[in-house]
A protein has these predicted regions:
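Short, charge-rich amphipathic alpha-helices with coiled-coil/heptad character
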Residues: 1-20
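Extended alpha-helical coiled-coil "stalk/arm" regions
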Residues: 28-57
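Short, glycine/alanine-rich amphipathic alpha-helical segment
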Residues: 48-73
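Long amphipathic alpha-helical coiled-coil segments
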Residues: 34, 69-98
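Terminal, compositionally biased segments
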Residues: 2-7, 93-99
Length: 99
């Protein structure tokens, strides 16, 4: 894992672009998986007693596991992108002697 605190502002901006690209692609895959989940729910809703049981059953599928993994990665990326944004702001203010 890279230490973002040692990156220059241009390196941080480039890293942020790469993360944003990954975030976008993961979001596209998430949409596909959510559509699959809707089809799964439609197919198996009558065979389970509750929505929670249906959700647990979905989470045991490969696609359900992938969706959970993507959700966790997206949340992590949101925090990292926010940290990079803050770090860029601090570095820019330091460059202007405003800190």
């Amino acid at each position: 894992m890279e230490d973002i605190t040692k990156m220059t502002p241009s390196e941080l901006a480039n890293h942020r672009l790469q993360l944003a690209n990954f975030y976008s692609k993961a979001g596209e895959r998430k949409v596909q998986l959510m559509k699959l989940r809707a089809l799964y729910y439609e197919s198996f809703r009558e065979s389970v007693k509750s929505d929670a049981a249906l959700e647990r059953k979905w989470e045991l599928t490969n696609e359900g596991l992938e969706l959970m993994e993507i959700n966790m990665k997206l949340k992590s990326l949101e925090h990292k992108l926010s940290a990079i944004r803050t770090l860029l702001e601090v570095k820019n203010n330091e460059a202007r002697n405003q800190y």
